[in-house]
Amino acid sequence: IFFILLAILTLQACNPKSADSSTTSASSQLWLVNMNDAQAQSVKDQKPILVYFTSSDTCGLCEQLETDIFSTPMFKEWAEKKVVLFKVDFSTLDQLPPGSQEQNTAMARSLKVSTYPTFWMLSVTHEVENGRFKIKPIGYTGYHPSPEKLIGALQNFVRR
């Protein structure tokens, strides 16, 4: 998995990002959509990356997460303190930033994600000698119906 993720990062680093590619819009403004941005934020803040795999226009449970969990003060406060939020969206609409489809497909393959919603927690370090990011998968989970249950499941993967 490490080498596949390293290949993703190398490919992503070669893709110029558009001005609007760093975060998603609407109800999930806290979610980054560019892996380079998520890695840099993770290293800077010394927090793991919470990767959220979704298909925002076809996944009913994902829509529920947006309204019932991600928009709650409880989830927002927990996420701000504990993780860097990164969304991998497989929307069929043409609303994804340039390069996102390739990045998202590579990430889903490397982590063997086949259903939505899926959450992966990743640890990221920056290797100064070669300038690359080193990613280590920590754990994963699926849908949980409340902020308390989702946070409880994710908290198992957070060190602090």
Q: Whereabouts are the PLM-identified features?
A:
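Non-catalytic, surface beta->alpha helical segment in thiol-disulfide oxidoreductase systems
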Residues: D68, A106-S110, S114-R160
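Typically the conserved alpha-helix immediately C-terminal to a functionally engaged Cys/Sec
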Residues: C62-W78
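Thiol-based oxidoreductase modules, predominantly thioredoxin-like and allied folds used
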Residues: W31-L32, F75-E102
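Bacterial signal peptide processing site
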Residues: N15-K17
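A short beta-strand-turn-helix
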Residues: W31-I49
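C-terminal motif of bacterial Sec signal peptides marking the signal peptidase cleavage site
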Residues: L11-A13
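Sec-dependent N-terminal signal peptides
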Residues: I1-L9
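Short active-site neighborhood of thiol/selenol oxidoreductases, capturing the structured segment around
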Residues: D45-C59, F119
